[in-house]
Amino acid sequence: MDSDPRFAAAAGGAVRFLAEAAGMPEDVCKEFQEATVRASTKAFDAQPRQPHTVEFLVFGDRLEVAIDADVGSHAIRLSRSVVPQR
């Protein structure tokens, strides 16, 4: 992804969709979305001229997001446990 705030918002929307589909509570979905947008924006601001890779990883017990500019720095990783609604 290019360092565009619209891509940060899109990454947040994708995480929210995955979190809702996994049955996570609404407040957790919203927080994960906001955290993803913040992390994406932070990564974009740190390396504005570099393309970024955003990975969405779905496991049975958690969802993860990794944002990486692939310039030797460590990726920003976010993870939330899947807590199904009852």
Can you annotate each of these PLM segments?
Residues 1-25:
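Helix-loop-beta hinge of the Bergerat
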Residues 5-7, 30, 84:
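A generic structural micro-environment signature
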Residues 7-9, 32, 64:
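Residues in flexible loops and secondary-structure boundaries
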Residues 12, 25-31, 67-69:
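Residue-level signal for functionally critical sites in structured catalytic/ligand-binding pockets
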Residues 22-27, 78-81:
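Glycine-rich loops and low-complexity Gly/Arg-rich segments
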Residues 26-51:
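Conserved ATP-binding N-box helix of the HATPase_c
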Residues 42-86:
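Conserved beta-strand-loop-beta-strand hairpin that lines the nucleotide-binding pocket
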